[in-house]
Amino acid sequence: VLSVFVLGPLLTEVTQAEYWKSEQTRGYFTNLYLYITYYLPGVFTHNKLPNAVNSSLWSLPVEFAMYLLIVIIGFVRAPKWGVLAAALVFMALSAGWAFQATEMLVYYRTDMRQLVLCGVYFFVGACMSQFKVDRFFNLTYALAAVMVWLALSRWIVVFIMASWVFLPFIVLAFGT
């Protein structure tokens, strides 16, 4: 809302009349129901991704889907093992499809590969919460995890799969 009413009018290169009459201005409100639209007329026209007001909007439907899955897992009363099962499903989908897919599979303006790949990290992080791994979140373990993770970079497939566990641990350990 602030992007449309404050940022857009201040930064647009088109006239105010053109800005407010534009279909793109009204269309930007579709972001409120997670139908992602990046553009406002005449705003950021010279960026590498021209006209994109907020290029991180792609993550909103992905995040919403992850939180919705957490609610569903909680609703069926299988939080600990349900979260682990979700993490394993997302890992299997990542290994079996998302890394090998050559074409985007877009639903509701969201690339399903991104949903799967982000789902791995989200649910591994959720597992760390469920299984109380946070007792290991300190600088010593974080630095050790970074060193082990980087040592695995010699073997790309192992490194990628290890990233699913190491990156959430490292981020959460440094963040606490």
Regions found by a protein language model. Give the residues of each.
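Transmembrane alpha-helical segments
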Residues: 69, 73, 120-132, 167-175
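Alpha-helical transmembrane segments of multi-pass integral membrane proteins
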Residues: 122, 147-176
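Membrane-interface helix caps and helix-loop-helix hairpins in membrane proteins
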Residues: 49-53, 101-112, 133-134, 151-160
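Membrane-interface helix-loop-helix regions
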Residues: 2-62, 167-171
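Aromatic-anchored segments of alpha-helical transmembrane domains
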Residues: 89-101, 144-156
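Solvent-exposed interhelical
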Residues: 64-92, 129-141
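Membrane-interface micro-motifs in multi-pass membrane enzymes
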Residues: 56-62, 110-123, 160-161
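Short helix-capping/hinge motifs at transmembrane helix termini and TM-loop junctions
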Residues: 6-15, 77-78, 100-101, 132-133
